[in-house]
Amino acid sequence: MSTTIEIPESSKVAKGKAVAVVAPARPGGWKKGVAIMDFILRLGAIAAALGAAATMGTSDQTLPFFTQFFQFEASYDSFTTFQFFVITMSLVGGYLVLSLPFSIVAIVRPHAVGPRLFLIILDTAFLTLATAGGASAAAIVYLAHNGDQDTNWLAICNQFGDFCAQTSAAVVSSFVAVVVLVLLIIMSALAIGKP
């Protein structure tokens, strides 16, 4: 047996207005957007760093004329600074690939501080490495373009134009990676610092 209670609607009951209660926005919701941007910037930095290493590593030019005893060739492995550049940019690119899972964790858990702190520390270390490699290669590229009259070093880019164009492009690409790493560090620091 079931008992039902009928309540008729009455027009005598005054209708009132209730206060709309909206759930407050979760603080720090913007951190997920920062984490997604972090991931995208990491992909760009990977392309810039590995592109710089590949461009420098394949820079090679042989002049069409040669003598009986000499052949004029310019290659990245003729300069230890360029070898250092290829190694450092390869290391930076490899680190950035290995940092992608931590960036994904920051997307899934935007309020987790551990992965961001870990990335800030390693990003800073590899930023230093990328800056050192890029700056040292930039100095040699400058000498290749302009030479130095005081030390009697001649500019070689008049003869080895393709080689100089490739090395210059590699240096520019490395500094793009450096700028992206700086942006990554700033974004991660802001995400950790603000609630």
From Swiss-Prot:
Superkingdom: Eukaryota
GO biological process terms on file: cell wall modification; cell-cell junction assembly
Segments in the Extracellular topological domain: 55-83, 138-171
Short name of one Pfam family: CASP_dom
InterPro entries in alphabetical order: CASP/CASPL, CASP_dom, CASPL
Membrane topology: Multi-pass membrane protein
Gene Ontology cellular-component annotations: Casparian strip; plasma membrane
Cysteines paired by S-S bonds: none
Regions of this protein lying in the Cytoplasmic compartment: 1-33, 105-116, 193-195
Membrane-crossing segments per the record: 34-54, 84-104, 117-137, 172-192
UniProt entry keywords in alphabetical sequence: Cell membrane, Cell wall biogenesis/degradation, Membrane, Transmembrane, Transmembrane helix
Compartment(s) of residence: Cell membrane
Homology family: Belongs to the Casparian strip membrane proteins (CASP) family.
Subunit structure: Homodimer and heterodimers.
Stated role: Regulates membrane-cell wall junctions and localized cell wall deposition. Required for establishment of the Casparian strip membrane domain (CSD) and the subsequent formation of Casparian strips, a cell wall modification of the root endodermis that determines an apoplastic barrier between the intraorganismal apoplasm and the extraorganismal apoplasm and prevents lateral diffusion.
NCBIfam families: A_tha_TIGR01569
Name of the molecule in the record: Casparian strip membrane protein 1
